[in-house]
């Protein structure tokens, strides 16, 4: 099994206690894969309340910090794709750097960013 990167839609699905994301997450952990959550994704999904299901999911994830290099690459990706969604761009750059599968509720926008970079990106919709 390859690495996995979660976008905001995956975190929202976990908080909604959707069976599909939990099955995928349990399978990843069973195969000793710790999904990556870019810090920008966490910021977009976190609303300050208890968010018990999201907190439970995050315990099995690695939070990837927003480094200067990642920020620059995400900004360049936004420019190439003519979009302003830096969170989506961060997900794409992050996943491409490792060859991860991206778990998303927004495959169209992520595919558009990857296409603008002429890079193949594996997507799984939730």
Residue ranges and their predicted role:
Residues 36, 64, 122-124:
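General small-molecule cofactor/ligand-binding pocket signal
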Residues 43, 61-81, 93, 107:
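Acidic catalytic patch
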Residues 1-37, 46-59:
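Short, well-structured N-terminal submotif of metal-dependent ribonuclease cores
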Residues 51-56, 81-82, 120-122:
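Short, hinge-like loop/turn segments at secondary-structure boundaries
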Residues 96-126:
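Acidic, PIN/NYN-like endoribonuclease modules and their adjacent C-terminal/linker elements
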Residues 21, 42, 51-54, 71, ...:
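A general structural signal for well-ordered alpha-helical segments in protein cores
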Residues 37, 65, 86, 104-105:
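Short beta-strand scaffold positions
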Residues 85-101:
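Acidic, metal-associated active-site segment
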């Amino acid at each position: 099994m390859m690495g996995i990167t979660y976008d905001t839609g995956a975190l929202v699905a976990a908080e909604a206690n959707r069976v599909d994301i939990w099955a995928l997450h349990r399978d990843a952990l069973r195969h000793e894969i710790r999904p990556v959550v870019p810090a920008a994704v966490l910021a977009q999904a976190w609303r300050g309340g208890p968010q018990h299901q999201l907190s439970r999911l995050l315990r099995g994830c690695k939070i990837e910090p927003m480094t200067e290099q990642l920020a620059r690459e995400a900004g360049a990706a936004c420019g190439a794709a003519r979009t302003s969604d830096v969170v989506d761009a961060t997900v794409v750059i992050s996943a491409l750097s490792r060859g991860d599968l991206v778990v998303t509720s927004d495959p169209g926008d992520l595919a558009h960013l990857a296409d603008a970079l002429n890079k193949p990106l594996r997507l799984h919709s939730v």
